[in-house]
């Protein structure tokens, strides 16, 4: 029996480093695929359509909402983000594990819709460090940075319902902790019992 693919959902305040962590962990686990979200925001320097995000107009995004094409979607800091339900269902059925880089609103929607997801919250070491990282983004205005900092406190409070919390202070350590979570989840009894039962003829 083919194992169902696992959804690894990463959320964090903007600037905590979850996108960079996602990219790094996919290099470590080649069988793990990144679920590319749709967004209405403007691409940042170096971002590639279809790899980092599917960049679409607000009209196209709302057409997809009306057509019930999203497993989850949310408006965050004035921009819309969404995950294709078809992408999730096809990959899970094929036994492909996906890593999703999404906000708290979207994570809540997925929790209600899909069982067995692994929810991981990435924290910055402090608000001061978060502000420093956001200030390093040339694409964000002072107004946007202030709005993200103000939103971070509420977002961090939501971390209590996630399965795991990783503090991204030293990046290499955060990578190792995320790697450990994925390895542990791959060994979870509920995920491997069917395969083990077939091998050892367990009743």
UniProtKB/Swiss-Prot annotation:
Gene3D superfamilies listed in its UniProt record: Guanylate Kinase phosphate binding domain (3.30.63.10), P-loop containing nucleotide triphosphate hydrolases (3.40.50.300)
Family: Belongs to the guanylate kinase family.
InterPro entries reported for this sequence: GK/Ca_channel_bsu, Guanylate_kin-like_dom, Guanylate_kinase, Guanylate_kinase_CS, P-loop_NTPase
Recorded GO CC terms: cytosol
Pfam family, one: Guanylate_kin
Protein name: Guanylate kinase
Organism: Geobacter sulfurreducens (strain ATCC 51573 / DSM 12127 / PCA)
Top-level enzyme category: transferase
Protein task: Essential for recycling GMP and indirectly, cGMP.
Entry's localization field: Cytoplasm
CDD domains, per the entry: GMPK
Reactions catalysed: GMP + ATP = GDP + ADP
Residues bound to ATP: 12-19
E.C. designation(s): 2.7.4.8
Organism domain of life: Bacteria
Residue ranges of domain Guanylate kinase-like in the record: 5-183
One function term, GO molecular function aspect: guanylate kinase activity
